[in-house]
Every structure is written in C-alpha cells, then in structure tokens.
Amino acid sequence: MFNHRIEGKDAIVADRNPETHVIDFRAAEHLLAARDPRGAVKLLDSVIAAHPENTAARLLRARAFFAAAQLRPAQLEFELVLEREPDNAFAHFALARTYERSGQAAQATRHFRLAAALDPKPEYLQAAGFDTGN
C-alpha cells in the first residue's frame, strides 16, 4: 500500500467533494453580494476546477471578475458561458457591460442588442438603444 501525502493546492482540491462545492458556490454568491468579489473568485476556482462544465459557477465567477474590475478574465468567462448557452440574455448583457467598461463600443452594442432580442427587459432595451415607448 502506498502512503503518500498530498500537499499544497492539490490537497485543497483533493479535500473537496460535491457537497463542499455546493457550499463554496453558495458562499461565493454571498461574498459577491457582500462586495467581496475576490473572495468569491477564490472559492469558485476550486468549484470550476472540479466541475469545468458548470455554467452557473462560470457565470458567477465572470460576475465576480467584473465586480473586481478584472475585465479580461470576466470577458473570457462570459464568452465561455455564451459558447455553451448562446441564448443566455443575462450573459450577453453582462458581456456587453464588460466590453463597454473596456472601451469596446461596437462589441458592447452587439451584445446589448442580442440581450434585448432574447429578453426584452426594459434595462436591456434601453442599453441596446431601442425605444421603450416611455
């Protein structure tokens, strides 16, 4: 029988299980709501390492990156979410805001319009420049 010890970051990942990943995800939601996006990202890193296909975790991490003004990582995460869920209006809207903050107006406009087309919420319509009739 081999008896070796896992140390460092690998030990943290090895210690995790599906239940702790759910707890970490929920805790990350609370950290983001409490304006601690960097703390949320740290928790979500282990969740995504174990479940890279989890779109909800990636979307939450993208929001945390955005809140921490880490625009490039936010953009990459939102794009990955949209590869998997091209009809996710919120992801289009959030990606548009990310492009807007990074000075990429043409890309922002495109995604604002996609968000509004997918879900005609007043906030999405206004951001897309569509007349809301108000």
Language-model features: where?
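Alpha-helical segment of the N-proximal tetratricopeptide repeat
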Residues: P18-E53, A67
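Start-of-helix register in tetratricopeptide repeats
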Residues: V22, A56, P73, F90, ...
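Structural signature of tandem alpha-helical TPR/SEL1-like repeats
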Residues: A34-K42, A68-L80, S102-L114
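Structural marker of alpha-solenoid helical repeat scaffolds
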Residues: R16, A50, R84, R101, ...
